[in-house]
Design a protein with these regions (language model features):
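Amphipathic alpha-helical segments within well-ordered protein domains
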Residues: 3, 42-43, 81
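Short, hinge-like loop/turn segments at secondary-structure boundaries
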Residues: 48-51, 87-88, 125-129
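Short, conserved active-site loops that position catalytic residues or coordinate cofactors/metal ions
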Residues: 34-40
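Short, well-structured N-terminal submotif of metal-dependent ribonuclease cores
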Residues: 1-32, 46-56, 133
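Active-site phosphate/pyrophosphate-handling residues
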Residues: 1, 36, 95-96
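Active-site neighborhoods of divalent-metal-dependent phosphate/nucleic-acid chemistry enzymes
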Residues: 69-107
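Helix-adjacent hinge/juxtasegments
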Residues: 43-70
Length: 134
């Protein structure tokens, strides 16, 4: 979702922009972003776009009240390895997200990546919808 937000050419750019804006304004739950996601996203932007785009995203993440960067503890890393081994369709970074979600008892992930769909206990959201609003 963060990559789509930063790439105007991405098919999901407008939707990602709406999700990020809603998070920034407090209309969505605070989005926890693991250090793996930050690393993966910044590296991608640095290599495929421009360094300044990667820096802009980092600054947005740490300054936004709608996002909370979190460090993945060793236990999550170990759980991510197990999830990665068990799920051939799940990238390691996604497995790390799921491990964090399981530890924190978080059900929802904002993502355009349907690799999360088969994971039990994870509900993927791809619109600026607050799952806790009636």
């Amino acid at each position: 979702m963060l990559l789509a937000r930063m790439s105007r050419k991405d098919a999901h750019h407008d939707t990602a922009r709406r999700i990020v804006e809603a998070a920034d304004h407090g209309d969505l739950p605070t989005m926890r972003v693991t250090n793996y996601v930050v690393t993966e996203t910044l590296n991608y932007l640095h290599e495929r776009q421009e360094h300044d785009v990667a820096v802009e995203l980092y600054d947005r993440l740490v300054q936004s009240a709608g996002f909370e960067p979190v460090h993945t503890p060793k236990a999550d890393f170990s759980q991510a390895v197990d999830l990665f081994r068990e799920n051939s369709g799940l990238a390691f970074g996604d497995a790390a997200i799921v491990a964090c979600m399981q530890r924190e008892d978080i059900e929802y992930v904002y993502s355009f990546d349907d690799d999360f769909d088969p994971v039990t206990g994870v509900t993927r959201l791809n619109t600026a919808t607050n799952p806790f609003s009636p």
